[in-house]
């Protein structure tokens, strides 16, 4: 009896040391699973996006819309734009490890549960564009880690909780278009939006809150309010003017001299710096970003020293910088900042990227505009890019590679399906996917992508991208769409599997110029181990590798219409619907092969996908890895 008892005791000690063990109830039920099932039961899910949430499961980390930490704790509930309705359950307060809650653009109704204040690790809360009503719970003031709070476009009423003044880390707040009243705490957030609330006001002007509705207040980037001075300040100004009235003439002369000096210095400095407050750029929607002076960024990067260069891209160099408070940043210095079209590109990026807030997208931190310079400031990603990490030692473990694939896919889903207008990246590659401190994927460099309003595609006379990642239709016609990004993402998946860039992989002696055909051949012959990064050794799951290769081949099909949407890609990477999609794609391939065989007998056909890949590989065989490409489209169709 003694050995079994000892083993049981040892097992108990080991299991209790696991972080996730604390989540188990006395009956061995995962408390996070219980909470999520209660949330699911109160929501109406017409499209079945939560069908993978199984109450009999002990591991919610494999569920759709759920993100977990390396310790298998639920840290993200992300179900934006999923047509969900019903109520948000108070059980959300039991998910105490949550860091991100994204439920925007649904039709969830009812009050915001007060239990949400128990999420002490929560950093991002987005409940915007739903039908929540009632008061904002005072427990929101307990979310001391909160950085982003969006409650806009609901029907919330009552005052904003005074306890929210405790939110010392809050960077961005959007309460616009509700029915809120009363003052906003003075030091709540660096940037916030309260327009569309008829009786909301500044904390310093509380006496005006319940009178006639004032005009919406405007805010500068540093949070200062516009408008007239309060009455007490006007009285002091009047007394000051009377007391010194006898010296008005002298003061006038001094002011005139000072004005002349200011004009002279301003005219001289215009050759170096551009005043962004001038009328000609007032139409820039600055969003949630900070304005830097050129000298600030020059000092932060040590004069844009070559030793601080993090990378070079088609739009300019990226420099490592350190702000006076010690914050590390990445500064992108755009090429030809004063050239024709440069300002329009800059405005596009500042306006659009500042509104694109997602855990898997690189957030724009600030900007700088001068007469000759355009610069963008981002948070510094300590783990670099996926491309650099794949070349480093030790090899990136397989589980991390899978997590990177899913994270990058979710970021692209947000750009394609949740931004209005949608954003097409046009250069999806490992070098443009960064890794944060937890090795989570963060997609960057999408700010200068072509934006589509509500059209399906865009035709341009210039093709920008990286050799090996450019979709065939984009290279040949200049026509880009969200399926162009899907193609690039498929190549990214192969980079994660092989540990090589597209050009490295395509130039090897065994399969030069026909990479995708060779990958498909290895997959069909069940030889995927030939593809796997040798640095992994045996540390990978063969079935998972086969599935990722299948998804990559689906994404890189020659015809854009046959490629899946990025939301479908996410589901397939999570194990939902891949088998059916692969079978259907195999049918397409068989039909295409039969058609090609017939056309060879009857005429000289246009080059198929394989020939295109081979020709592409030969044309650019002299290029180096990650070479950027900016060429004129071979043939343009449709309007330019």
From Swiss-Prot:
Listed PROSITE patterns: PROTEIN_KINASE_ATP, PROTEIN_KINASE_DOM, PROTEIN_KINASE_ST
Annotated ATP binding sites: 310-318, 332
GO molecular function terms noted in the UniProt entry: ATP binding; protein serine kinase activity; protein serine/threonine kinase activity
Transmembrane segments: 242-262
One Pfam assignment: LRR_14
Principal subcellular localisation of the protein: membrane
Function according to Swiss-Prot or TrEMBL: LRR receptor kinase that may be involved in defense response.
Protein's name in the database: LRR receptor kinase SERL2
């Amino acid at each position: 009896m003694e050995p079994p008892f000892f083993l049981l005791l040892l097992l108990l000690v080991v299991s209790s040391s696991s972080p996730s063990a604390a989540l188990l109830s006395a009956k061995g039920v995962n408390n996070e699973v219980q909470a999520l099932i209660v949330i699911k039961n109160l929501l109406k899910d017409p499209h079945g996006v939560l069908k993978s949430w199984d109450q009999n499961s002990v591991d919610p980390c494999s569920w759709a819309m759920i993100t977990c930490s390396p310790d298998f704790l639920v840290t993200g509930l992300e179900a934006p734009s999923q047509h969900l309705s019903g109520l948000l359950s108070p059980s959300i307060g039991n998910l105490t490890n949550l860091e991100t809650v994204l439920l925007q653009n649904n039709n969830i109704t009812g009050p915001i549960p007060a239990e949400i204040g128990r999420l002490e690790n929560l950093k991002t809360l987005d409940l915007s564009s739903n039908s929540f009503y009632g008061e904002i719970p005072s427990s929101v003031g307990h979310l001391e880690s909160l950085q982003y709070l969006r409650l806009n476009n609901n029907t919330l009423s009552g005052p904003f909780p005074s306890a929210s003044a405790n939110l010392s880390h809050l960077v961005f707040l959007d309460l616009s278009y509700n029915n809120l009243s009363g003052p906003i705490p003075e030091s709540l957030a660096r940037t916030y939006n309260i327009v569309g609330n008829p009786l909301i006001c500044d904390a310093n002007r509380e006496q005006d809150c319940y009178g006639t509705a004032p005009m919406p207040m405007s805010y500068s980037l540093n949070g200062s309010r516009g408008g007239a001075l309060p009455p007490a300040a006007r009285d002091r100004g009047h007394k000051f003017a009377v007391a010194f009235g006898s010296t008005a003439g002298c003061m006038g002369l001094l002011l005139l001299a000072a004005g002349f000096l200011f004009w002279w210095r301003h005219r001289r400095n215009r050759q170096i710096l551009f005043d962004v407050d001038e009328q000609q750029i007032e139409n820039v929607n600055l969003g949630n970003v900070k304005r830097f002076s050129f000298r600030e960024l020059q000092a932060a990067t040590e004069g844009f020293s070559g030793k601080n260069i993090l990378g070079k891209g088609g739009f300019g160099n990226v420099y490592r910088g350190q702000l006076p408070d010690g914050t590390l940043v990445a500064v992108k210095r755009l090429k030809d900042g004063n050239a024709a079209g440069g300002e329009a590109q800059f405005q596009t990026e500042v306006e659009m990227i500042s509104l694109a807030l997602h855990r898997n997208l690189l957030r724009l931190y600030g900007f700088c505009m001068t007469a000759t310079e355009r610069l963008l400031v981002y948070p510094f990603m300590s783990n670099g890019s996926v491309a650099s990490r794949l070349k480093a030692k030790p090899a990136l473990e397989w589980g991390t590679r899978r997590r990177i694939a899913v994270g990058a896919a979710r970021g692209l889903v947000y750009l394609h399906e949740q931004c209005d207008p949608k954003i097409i990246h046009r250069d999806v590659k490992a070098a443009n996917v960064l890794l944060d401190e937890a090795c989570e994927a963060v997609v960057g460099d999408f700010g200068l992508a072509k934006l589509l309003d509500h059209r399906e595609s865009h035709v341009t006379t210039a093709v920008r991208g990286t050799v090996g990642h450019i979709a065939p239709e984009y290279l040949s016609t200049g026509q880009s769409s969200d399926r162009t990004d899907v193609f690039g993402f498929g190549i990214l998946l192969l980079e994660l599997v092989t540990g090589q860039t597209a050009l490295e992989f395509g130039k090897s002696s065994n399969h030069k110029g026909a990479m995708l055909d060779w990958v498909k051949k290895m997959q069909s012959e069940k030889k995927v181990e030939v593809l796997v990064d040798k640095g992994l050794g045996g540390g990978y799951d063969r079935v998972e590798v086969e599935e990722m290769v299948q998804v990559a081949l689906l994404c890189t099909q020659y015809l854009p219409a046959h490629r899946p949407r990025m939301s479908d890609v996410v589901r397939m990477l999570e194990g939902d619907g891949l088998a059916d999609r692969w079978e259907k794609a195999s049918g397409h391939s068989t039909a295409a092969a039969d058609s090609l065989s017939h056309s060879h007998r009857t005429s000289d056909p246009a080059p198929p996908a394989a020939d295109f890949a081979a020709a592409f590989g030969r044309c650019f065989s002299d290029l180096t890895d990650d070479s950027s490409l900016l060429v004129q489209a071979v043939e343009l169709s449709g309007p330019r």
